[in-house]
Amino acid sequence: MFLIDRAREVRIKRANTDWWINEKAIVASNGLTYIAYVTDMGEIHVKEFDAKCSRTPSRDVRLCRMNCTYADEHNAPSLCILENGRIMVTYTGHAQTHTLNYRITERPYDIMSFGKEYCITYENNVTYAQVFENTKRHEIWMFARVKSVTWEFRYSKDEGETWSEPTTFLKSDAGGLFYFDVRKQIIPTTDGIGEQWFFALYGHPRISSDHTVRSGIFDADGWLLTQDGKRTEVNLFDSDNSEIQLEKLDKVYQSPEGTTVRLLAVSPVMPYRIGLAAFTLDNADSIVYYAAEYNCGKWVLSEPVAKAGDFLAPNQTDGSQTYVGGMAFYYGVGEAGFNSADGGVIDSNRLYLSRTDGEYWYMESYVSHDCGKSYELEQIIRKIPNGKNIKIWRPTVPVYAQDNLPVYWHEGSYSAHTGGWNCDAVMLVEYDD
């Protein structure tokens, strides 16, 4: 819990970091926080600021000039900070173009030194690039959705100068898979510290025929692991054996008949946790938040955490009428992390969510004292009257976040798939000074 009475409100005006992009906010090794975002004018920006010291000047740089292709809030950019301090930002249109663009800084931690814009051309429309550094192999890994229902993997051995040919690791049709959400995790190994990529995937809540959330892991060498760590025959680098068979993945949640689900969060730290919202289509009263945790060889769904209260865009008819406020998992260990000394039973989980009760919109934190079986309200971080056409959505926890800035969210008017939205990225920062 951070001290709201000591915290100051900070805003990034007209900033949106929505949708299936991880990582998009990172606390770098230099102690500064970097957030990549898209504006309602379709501009791609990076913000740099210090969440520890209020006297440190902040900086902001625009990487892409106004482009209506990017005005859709689904075009939030993906951020990657390499081990050597160079910063990479990747951005695409929302299924509008066959091109993916990116820029990399020439100097470490210097957002004023972004080099030229690079472009990767795909065979079909590309969306939702998710970019990470694999420090073991000294590679940049890129996951992206192609043709709306296929996911491809590429890697670069020379910091983005050249890229491998793509391998398809997920394939579906219009009634199947749409969304793949992956988080890089730092894990203990017999040799010290390792990396793995924990993911969850599912289909569109309205369009898909299978409303099941599934999970898996890629290790640092590209092998697909089951949730209990067993290696399968699937490998991202083997074009003949790169495709995941959905039925072989672990099931996190299978919707009861007549209901559907939205995947909301994949935890970047242990234990394995996935956040979701279950509901009946067109029934706002039915939306319930849950957190699933992997324990003793199986996924266990929590008791209901809270009711979402309403959809973000209930009057739209393009699929976005199923969007809800959102959830994010705390980044940390200790009081609200996984404490192996006591079995993880004391405040072992913390999560953030946004919801409404019809009268107010809330940003709240919840904590579990029983290894994720149930959650109780810990703190109301933000509360806004419902009558101002202002909503709260998409809580986001920066990678490596400290408690000076444990979470930020979006606040403003919401309109999906267009440039008609207008919101700020809002946060409460508890500075040290």
Predicted regions and their residues:
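Extracellular, repeat-based ectodomains that mediate carbohydrate processing or recognition
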Residues: 1-433
